[in-house]
C-alpha cells in the first residue's frame, strides 16, 4: 500500500488520528506483556487519553470527550464493550481482559478529568433555539440533569462533541446502539434527523450565548 505519490495513493492521516492509531497499535502489541508485568492502571489509562484527549477533551472527530462523565456511566460502558455488547472494534479490543476492578479504576480516573469547557464558537441561533425547545419538550433534563451534567448511569451531554452527540442519537434511534431498557430509542423515535442535528448543536454549545443577529 502506497502512502504518498502515484495513483491509488492513500492520503496521510491527520496528526490526531495518527497518534490515536499508533497508541492502539502499541497497546495491542504490548498489552499481554504489560499485564504479565502488572502494568499499572495509570499506564493503561494513558493509552485511553491518546484518543480521548489528555485533558479529557477529545479532538478527534466522532470520538467522545470523557471529562466530567459520571463514574457509574463509565463502568457501565466499559462493561458493555468488554462483553461485546457495544459495536466499536477498537473499544471492544481495549476492554478485553479488564477485570471488574480495572473497570472501576478506569471510571474513577475518568470522573476526575475536568469537564469540557463551553465552545469558544458562538452557536447558530436558529438551531440552538430549536434544540433548546426540544430539550424542554422531552425529558432530557430529567434523566441527564437540568444542566446536562449527567448522573449515575446517565452520561454528561453538556459541551460534548457535536458530531459524537449526533452519531450517538442516530444510533439510539436506529437501534444500532442499546440504551437502558429502550428508553432512548423510544424518546428519539418521533424526532426527525433535523431535530437530532438541532439537539446535538444545542447540547454541544450549552452555556454559550448565540451570536446576536
Describe every region a protein language model picked out:
Residues 36-55, 118-119, 123-146, 161:
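Sequence/structural segment immediately N-terminal to covalent heme-attachment motifs in c-type
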Residues 56-88, 92-98, 132, 136, ...:
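Gly/Gly-Pro-rich "capping" loops immediately C-terminal to redox-active cysteine motifs
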Residues 19-30:
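Bacterial N-terminal signal peptides
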Amino acid at each position: 500500500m502506497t502512502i504518498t505519490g502515484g495513483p491509488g495513493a492513500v492520503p496521510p492521516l491527520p496528526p490526531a488520528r495518527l497518534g490515536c492509531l499508533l497508541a492502539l497499535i502499541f497497546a495491542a502489541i504490548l498489552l499481554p506483556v504489560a499485564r504479565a508485568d502488572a502494568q499499572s492502571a495509570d499506564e493503561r489509562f494513558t493509552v485511553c487519553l491518546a484518543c480521548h484527549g489528555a485533558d479529557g477533551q477529545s479532538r478527534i472527530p466522532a470520538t467522545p470527550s470523557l471529562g466530567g462523565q459520571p463514574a457509574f456511566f463509565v463502568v457501565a460502558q466499559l462493561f458493555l464493550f468488554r462483553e461485546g455488547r457495544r459495536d466499536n472494534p477498537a473499544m471492544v479490543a481495549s476492554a478485553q481482559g479488564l477485570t471488574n476492578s480495572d473497570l472501576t479504576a478506569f471510571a474513577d480516573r475518568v470522573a476526575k478529568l475536568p469537564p469540557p469547557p463551553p465552545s469558544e464558537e458562538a452557536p447558530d441561533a436558529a438551531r440552538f433555539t430549536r434544540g433548546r425547545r426540544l430539550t424542554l419538550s422531552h425529558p432530557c433534563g430529567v434523566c441527564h440533569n437540568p444542566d446536562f451534567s449527567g448522573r449515575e448511569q446517565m452520561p454528561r451531554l453538556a459541551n460534548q462533541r457535536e458530531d459524537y452527540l449526533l452519531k450517538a442519537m442516530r444510533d439510539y434511534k436506529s437501534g444500532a446502539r442499546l440504551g437502558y431498557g429502550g428508553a432512548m430509542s423510544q424518546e428519539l423515535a418521533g424526532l426527525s434527523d433535523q431535530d437530532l442535528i438541532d439537539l446535538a448543536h444545542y447540547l454541544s454549545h450549552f452555556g454559550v450565548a448565540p451570536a446576536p443577529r
